[in-house]
């Protein structure tokens, strides 16, 4: 059983954070929250999303799991204006999701959850550095890096107490230095890892510019990026595997 009413912008933000990595996913409809966990086909990027029941205007669920085509669901949600309410109801007999937006009714065929890739385990990593920064600063660094390279280096200088976003191209280099005073918070430890810029660009599309983003970073370890939405009732964690550099 699943029946809910949610603000359009809240649903759109939730779907955006997952669709940047995968085309289809399982949605777990628990009684206290809606949750999604997915990994891209190359096993490089992961997303873990929870949206608390309190983020909805109304929410009833009993622990079921549905499979959805994210592009179709996003297209439907995109028909709504940001202030609209979206009504969602699962028909358990037909296994279809009934959606209503301001007089528009849509019935979405669901996917068998067993045919969708298994949800990943997101490891509990002990990462030495934690950087808290505005989403706009991450966007600035990624946009600059994209001008010169398809890889991006994230590192922390413990002595300088600064966070660096760097990219090195064939002829040009980019280096964004964010000192402690430019950050919301910094726990400095040994951290220096190289990542695929394409994946970070995709993740960055979902991160609001005014979001407070917590970055967990280590030495040639995956990076974790955490941020909230829906007035703190929605939570997203991205994890991205590093590119290991041979000596």
Curated annotation (Swiss-Prot):
GO terms for biological process: leading strand elongation; regulation of DNA replication. InterPro entries: DNA_clamp_sf, Pr_cel_nuc_antig, Pr_cel_nuc_antig_C, Pr_cel_nuc_antig_N. One of its GO terms (molecular function) is DNA binding. Keywords: DNA replication, DNA-binding. CDD domains: PCNA (cd00577). Sliding clamp subunit that acts as a moving platform for DNA processing. Responsible for tethering the catalytic subunit of DNA polymerase and other proteins to DNA during high-speed replication. Belongs to the PCNA family. Homotrimer. The subunits circularize to form a toroid; DNA passes through its center. Replication factor C (RFC) is required to load the toroid on the DNA. This is DNA polymerase sliding clamp. It comes from Halorubrum lacusprofundi (strain ATCC 49239 / DSM 5036 / JCM 8891 / ACAM 34).
């Amino acid at each position: 059983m699943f029946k809910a009413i949610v603000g359009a912008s809240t649903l759109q933000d939730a779907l955006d954070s997952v669709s940047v990595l995968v085309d289809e996913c399982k949605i777990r409809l628990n009684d206290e929250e809606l949750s999604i966990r997915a990994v891209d086909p190359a096993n490089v990027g992961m997303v873990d999303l929870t949206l608390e029941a309190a983020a909805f205007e109304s929410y009833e669920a009993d622990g079921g799991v549905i499979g959805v085509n994210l592009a179709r669901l996003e297209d439907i949600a995109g028909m709504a204006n940001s202030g609209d309410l979206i009504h969602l109801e699962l028909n358990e007999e037909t296994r279809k999701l009934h959606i209503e937006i301001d007089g528009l009714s849509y019935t979405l065929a669901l996917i068998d959850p067993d045919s969708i890739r298994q949800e990943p385990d997101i490891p509990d990593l002990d990462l030495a550095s934690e950087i808290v920064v505005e989403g706009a600063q991450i966007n600035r660094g990624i946009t600059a890096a994209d001008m010169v390279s398809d890889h991006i280096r994230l590192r922390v200088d413990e002595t300088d107490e600064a966070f660096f976003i760097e990219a090195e191209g064939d002829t040009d280099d980019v280096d964004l230095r964010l000192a402690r005073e430019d950050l919301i918070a910094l726990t400095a430890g040994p951290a220096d890892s190289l990542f695929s810029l394409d994946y970070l660009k995709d993740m960055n599309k979902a991160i609001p510019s005014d979001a407070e983003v917590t970055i967990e970073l280590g030495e040639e370890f995956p990076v974790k990026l955490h941020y909230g939405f829906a007035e703190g009732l929605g939570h997203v964690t991205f994890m991205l595997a590093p590119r290991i550099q041979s000596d």
